């Protein structure tokens, strides 16, 4: 062989194989995780979701991740209460997203998504986290 696969991959001639959670986020791992806080109003979360063009957001309190909000939660809440935007996030948030480790396989990550679970958080090992969405998984398919 004239060129080995590692040399070709390093120079962009071969596609990287996406097999682990960190492979999915490597192109945007430097971006901060956008979160909402339980005591904030729902309107603040909506504003943040619009600003960053995201459809789901993890919710934190002083202890850590305690919930989540997505478009579906917001829509259902708005249908039943037109004043949803003025309520605290803790009153309408859903369950927290599962937290995975960097080495988790794509197959394992994919199994965590469901109608009720729109995202997964990945523990970066340095006290910070990142988010993986269904869109990220679909976008990683070559």
Protein language model features and the residues they cover:
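Tandem CBS (Cystathionine beta-synthase) repeat/Bateman regulatory domains
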Residues: 1-142
């Amino acid at each position: 062989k004239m060129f080995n696969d590692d040399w070709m991959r390093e120079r962009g001639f071969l596609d990287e194989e996406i097999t682990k959670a960190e492979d999915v986020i490597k192109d945007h791992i430097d971006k901060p995780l956008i979160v909402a806080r339980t005591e904030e109003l729902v309107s603040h979360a909506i504003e943040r979701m619009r600003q960053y063009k995201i459809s789901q957001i993890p919710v934190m309190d002083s202890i850590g991740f305690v919930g989540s909000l997505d478009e579906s939660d917001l829509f259902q809440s708005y249908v039943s209460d037109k004043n949803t935007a003025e309520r605290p996030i803790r009153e309408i948030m859903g369950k927290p997203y599962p937290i995975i480790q960097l080495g988790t396989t794509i197959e394992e990550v994919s199994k965590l998504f469901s109608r009720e679970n729109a995202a997964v958080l990945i523990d970066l090992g340095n006290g910070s986290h990142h988010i993986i969405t269904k869109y990220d998984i679909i976008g990683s398919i070559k």
